[in-house]
Amino acid sequence: MHYCNKDIGSFGETIAVDYIKNCGYIILERNFRCKLGEIDIIAKDKNFIVFIEVKTRYSYIYGSPSEAITFRKQNKIYKTAQLYIIKKAIHNKFYFRFDVIEVILNTLNSNYSVKLIKNAFQI
């Protein structure tokens, strides 16, 4: 990913964090990294720990942003989530879910749209 795409991704993650906070989520981690991979946002939603992948695009021209999350990427997120659960010793305390947030930016102005897909995938 080149520099401009990193900026777009980071901007999308900031929008996503604001959005889910307004939905009542509590942010636990941003950009959790380990040797297995990275999870954009880890949050608490009631009795769930939610592992969230954020995809930011300027349009749907190449399909929806969530379509870019391949099975391989899902598996990587799942394994990273497993490590987080073990590290935090929370396996018996919460339910777990994988959400996706799509952020579509507008090139003409500062408007954007956000779509939260709860339980977007299961491994």
UniProtKB/Swiss-Prot annotation:
GO MF annotations, alphabetized: nucleic acid binding
Family: Belongs to the UPF0102 family.
This protein's name: UPF0102 protein CBO2440/CLC_2288
Pfam families recorded: UPF0102
CDD domains: PoNe_Nuclease
PANTHER family: UPF0102 PROTEIN YRAN (PTHR34039:SF1)
Listed InterPro entries: Restrct_endonuc-II-like (IPR011335), tRNA_endonuc-like_dom_sf (IPR011856), UPF0102_YraN-like (IPR003509)
